[in-house]
Amino acid sequence: MAFFAPVYEQLMPVMNELLLAYSSLHRLSGSEDAEHAASLLVNLLRSHGLEARLEQCPLLLSDPITGSLTLTDFPDWQCQAKTRSFSAHCPQGVGAALYYDAQSTLARTDLEWQAWAQQVEGKIVVADQGFEDYVQRLDAARAVGLVHIWTSAETALHEETVGPIWGTPTLEDAQRYPRLPVISINQRDGQRLLNTMTHTRLPVGAELRTELARHVRTCSLPVVEIAGQSDEFVLLSSHYDSWHEGVTDNATGNALCVAMAIHFQQQSAMLRRGLRIAWWPGHSNARYGGSTWYADNYRQQLGERCVAHINVDSPGCLNAVQVVINASGAESNSFLNHAVEVITGKPALRITPLGKGGDQSFWGSGVPLHFALREVPIEKTSDSPGSGGGWWWHTEEDTYDKVDLNILWRDCQIHAHWLSALLIEPSLPIDAVDYLENNRQALRQLQQRLDPEFSLEQIAQKLRDLQDPIAHLQHLSHSHPDRWQSILVRTVADLHRLRYSSTDDFHYDLSYRGGAFPGFQPLAADLGQTTPETALMMQTQYRRQCDRALALLQKISDRLQK
């Protein structure tokens, strides 16, 4: 394969130009700065001869404004606090006694959850986590509010969301948004709060106030396309909205995508497949609203023509010297690692399955390859899941000085290698044989966590039966891609539906429902420690998810027998 390396002297000034421009823009979707950023991006692309356009997508946005915590009997006690996107809007405040859930991060049985619900009802709960599923339980238990204590020592407060809905909600989804206020405080203030609670005989009364702006706005979604010889294309994406200036999350990703657009426009005569690049709005305050809108509005086109989705989120971060790859599992590991080895001299630190996040909105779209580069420091000192592990993630401190241009250039070159292979080579780097085995292993691990009543043996047998047919198809596809590759693509896409989704192609799982075979994950509980009501619901979910899985596997089997 002919590979033309990106040229530093040509592309780095363009990337840096965008970084400097974005470093003074607060790009929360729906804001003037965000719309200005989208226009600036399109104008930059056009100035380099690219035909960029702005799509328009309506999104439901939840913008955190203020959050506060006061203690009724300790008027001098103060702390900094932030509310969370899609928290309840309670500007008048809510008051109740504080209750510390010391085991909030531990697993509980159904009966333990029932007892817990009685303890938290009517309380403002203090906890060491604030994930969406926990907030949902608090809401159902009629807790009054949540104070989330951040678990690592940085004093900066991180913006986050408690929205359980992936993308824009439907009418039924809307009922799931929290009805209680949620705030976060840092670890230092959290320990002060717990000390006050510990050394006070009577329950400590508190008041939470939150202000949020929940509204609908039409947001810009920049897109550029570079045509190839066929109508197939690779989708490269990054979210351009941010919390505050968000230079590493995600102006660096936006700049990398601009560089790839310029580079591959210059190689367009060589491209077998096209390159489509999208910059999403609504990642932050619409819970992946932009990418979900795109999946909804281009579903057929994605299913028929898109061969890969590469998401770019937070490259080029200070101290993030180690490369990690998050991938669907259908990608050849040698393909993924080759680009990293060529640029860094060694393979990725690890390749792990994609989790819930990162605008992974395309599991029901029929796309076979999904992966993303991630990077981590040698020594992690923060519980920050983004910005290369940097403590500044989702804070006002995510500024230009947190960028390492050398690391950004490294990441740019890795993406150029990946894209060159995908855009030029006739065979896609699909390893369906290895992916099938990974799914079998994940199913075995899941079975060990389930009650024996929830047997997955029928699904396991169907997966075993597919081993030889898929190996044969993969051999044919690599030998004669023009004839057989489309069948391999559809087969892998159905395996993705099995592993990464629990619903149909036209709906989305909740934002917190992850793990392999997500429809079965909630069944990982001891039936002997559940109420009859919960047991019946679990049995019903098991039956429906089994039927869905077996139908998908039968569809694959029928296709391979033709």
What are these model-predicted stretches?
Residues 2-9, 23-32, 100, 122-129, ...:
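Second-shell loop/turn segments in exported
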Residues 413-417, 422-562:
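C-terminal non-catalytic alpha-helical accessory regions
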Residues 2, 8-13, 20-121:
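Noncatalytic luminal/extracellular "stalk/propeptide" segments of secretory-pathway proteins
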Residues 79-175, 179-181, 347-348:
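Extracellular/luminal Protease-associated
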Residues 242-328, 429:
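Acidic/histidine-rich catalytic neighborhood of metal-dependent amide-processing enzymes
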Residues 85-111, 169-248, 259-274, 296:
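Soluble metallo-hydrolase cores and metallopeptidase-like ectodomains found primarily
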Residues 152-153, 212-214, 240-243, 278-286, ...:
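Acidic, glycine-rich active-site loops and adjacent beta-strand->loop/helix elements
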Residues 318-437, 494-512, 516:
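Active-site-adjacent substrate-binding region
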